[in-house]
Amino acid sequence: MLLKLAGIGKLFGARAVLRNVSFEVHPGTVTLLVGANGAGKTTLLKIMAGLARPTVGTVERFCEDGGLGYLGHATFIYPGLTALENLAFWSGMHGNPTDKATLSEALARVELAPFAEERAGTFSRGMAQRLNLARILLQSPP
C-alpha cells in the first residue's frame, strides 16, 4: 500500500468540504477523483500530498518523502525555455536527474518527445500540463 486515508474531514470555518473520506492507494494503480466544482477534490489532493492537514481523520503514507506528487490547476513553466530546458531546470532545482536521456524519457512518457526542443511558450495548455506532469515523474514516484 502507498497511501491510506481514514475518516478524512476538512472544515473551512463552518463549511465542511470533506466528510468521512476513506480509501487506500496501492502501487501501480491509478486513482481517479471525480466531482463537481467545489466538491473538495483539490483539498483532498493537497491533504494526500501533505500540503494541507485534515480537520479530522488520518493519512498514512508508506513511501519516502517526495514519493507523492501534486500537480495543481495553475502551474508554471518558463515560456522562453525548451521543454528539455524546463525539465532540466526544475529537476536540478529539486536534486533530481538532469541528464538528457532521463529528461527525454520523461517527455516520452507524457507524449512530448517530438517537442523536446520547442519553446514551452508555444505549447497548448494541455501540453504545458503534460510538461509539468513530466516534472513530477522525474521525482521517481513509487
Stretch-by-stretch model annotation:
Residues 34-36:
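The feature captures the beta-strand-to-loop junction immediately N-terminal to the Walker
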Residues 3, 18-20:
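Conserved structural motif at the start of ABC-family nucleotide-binding domains
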Residues 49:
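Helix-to-loop junction immediately C-terminal to a conserved catalytic motif
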Residues 88, 92, 98-115:
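Conserved ABC ATPase "signature" region
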Residues 133:
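Hydrophobic anchor residue at the start of the ABC signature
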Residues 53-67:
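Conserved ABC transporter NBD signature motif
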